[in-house]
Swiss-Prot record:
Protein's name in the database: tRNA-2-methylthio-N(6)-dimethylallyladenosine synthase
EC main group: transferase
Annotated localization: Cytoplasm
Reactions performed catalytically: N(6)-dimethylallyladenosine(37) in tRNA + (sulfur carrier)-SH + AH2 + 2 S-adenosyl-L-methionine = 2-methylsulfanyl-N(6)-dimethylallyladenosine(37) in tRNA + (sulfur carrier)-H + 5'-deoxyadenosine + L-methionine + A + S-adenosyl-L-homocysteine + 2 H(+)
Cysteine disulfide links: none
Positions bound to [4Fe-4S] cluster 2: 153, 157, 160
Gene3D superfamilies the UniProt entry points to: Methylthiotransferase, N-terminal domain (3.40.50.12160), tm_1862 like domain (3.80.30.20)
Amino acid sequence: MYIRTFGCQMNEYDSDKMADVLRADQGLELTDNPEDADVILFNTCSVREKAQEKVFSDLGRVQHLKKQNPNLVIGVGGCVASQEGEAIVKRAPYVDVVFGPQTLHRLPDLIKRRRAQGVSQVDISFPEIEKFDALPPPRVDGATAFVSIMEGCSKYCSFCVVPYTRGEEVSRPFDDVLLEVADLADQGVKEVTLLGQNVNAYRGAMGDSGEIADFAMLLEYVHEIPGIERIRYTTSHPKEMTQRMVDAYARLPKLVSFLHLPVQAGSDRVLAAMKRGYTALEFKSVVRRLRAARPSLTLSSDFIVGFPGETEEDFQKTMKLIEDVGFDTSFSFVYSRRPGTPAADLHDDTPQDVKLRRLQQLQALINQQAAAIAQGMIGTRQRVLVEGPSRRDPNELMGRTENNRIVNFPGVPRLIGHMVDVVVTHAHTNSLRGRVAGIERDTSGAE
């Protein structure tokens, strides 16, 4: 099987699960070459503009393979599939299966029905937690893994399609998450990333007791699982950053000193139009409390530039927020209209060249801040999880620091999958360079 993934880490996780269900049910293994595949899947993302056209363009590139091999199964999953549904088959009749993020576990049955009936199968329903109940146990090869703890979003920001493509927020049961993390730890995973559209909105049922665990409680329990040495999570929402969450940074050393906290804008007027549910001052208050609990915390964020009605004054307020807070990295884009969202109907009279100029200025400021953080790391001793050979030089190793910086350094292959101390010697634009200072034991549970 060949799977091409677009978009966020949730989609990466979903693609892994597609591979798991097809491997377990049909014995298929992954290939990097679509020409060698019996099943070709596109796991799509609808966040950016023209996502649908991108899907049909990619489908067109594999259509000839269907002509060569009529038994080939071509499928479209993800958020574009949820949005378009039957329209995908109408426009591209050679597509065999269309499925949403919540129905990927039904993929084997959809393929079987397609082969038995000779008719394209479409299932973009929202069966809530059924997806997780039907997935096979995770299989990983490496020291890091993703674990999805919830699906969907109930915030309904005016610009966002996620509530319409992934449904309302649904949390996995508390024990199910812990069992999956423990299973991954038994397979050698040392760093786990907990995933959700609004991951800190997690509210998981605790067995049959009727009690509900919040995200802070989940973090506390994951923290105690033997073998897990690092905990990350994404994506969080500022409204859900409770005091219990803030306190977790003071109590849980395995929780990394890095947080992705999307703010989107620094103007209260724009934030209100986006329906984000907080002000710039409230966002800065959250950051201040987080850094009081964990002074070493670095932040990344999301920014939308050129939202309908954004004035130059609004934009300058965003720039001021960036200057006040300081960010390590950002995902920043010019606003793109998403059909079916409330913002799609807002009047937008800002010229495109103005939007692009603002985006360039914003990215330049954050790049400047990121460079300063990188320079400040030179000479410091960083705890690094070694992930594998360096992409630049296969004779060297690559790992990540707590603040998610890639570090390349000389080392022997036996270090892969282990924590090592690395002294940073150089800072480059997108990575660091260092040398090994010492090897930590696997049994270390402290940061």
